[in-house]
Amino acid sequence: LWEYNINFTIQREIPDNHYFYYTTLYPIHPDYQKRLATYRPFGSPIDSPAGIQGKATQFVMILDALQLRLLEKIRSDLAGYSVVRSTSPLDNRAIWLEIFAGGIHKGNSCQTLLKKLNINCKEVAGLGNDYNDIDFLDICAEAYLVANAPVNLQRHYKLVKSDKEEGFTEFISKVL
């Protein structure tokens, strides 16, 4: 990850995944700075792979507008991993790339749960709000997005009101 010139965090292994390593080798994105400040007690700085001890559950990269053009290159370079785009929960604007072991995403998690519960995907409705919900929504028989989801996702799914305007309530009334 060092070769992309993007700072990142490495979440430690469960149950200690609230602890993380982080880099500050490149100009720091304001959202990244806020994340580090918010969770400072749990973070340890590193400046090379040698600083990493133990296993990891997730990498998080926060991209600025220029770095966003690297998204497909990173996905291609890390083809054996799940590289999931999401919007920052901190500023609701910054683009995060979350990198997990291959096959780890909301869609597979949902399928695993449905299988254990003996429920067919054709019986499932889902509501999402961001890019990290795509894998989950794509397995649902009825897939909805809240109206304040990213515009370029909205043409792919049915829409309900925004999460600020009782979109969840509208979703429930449509699927029940």
Segments from the language model and where they lie:
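Conserved acidic, metal-coordinating active-site core of Asp-based
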Residues: 4-7, 11-125, 134
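Mg2+-dependent phosphoryl-transfer enzymes with acidic/Ser/Thr/Gly-rich catalytic loops
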Residues: 97-176
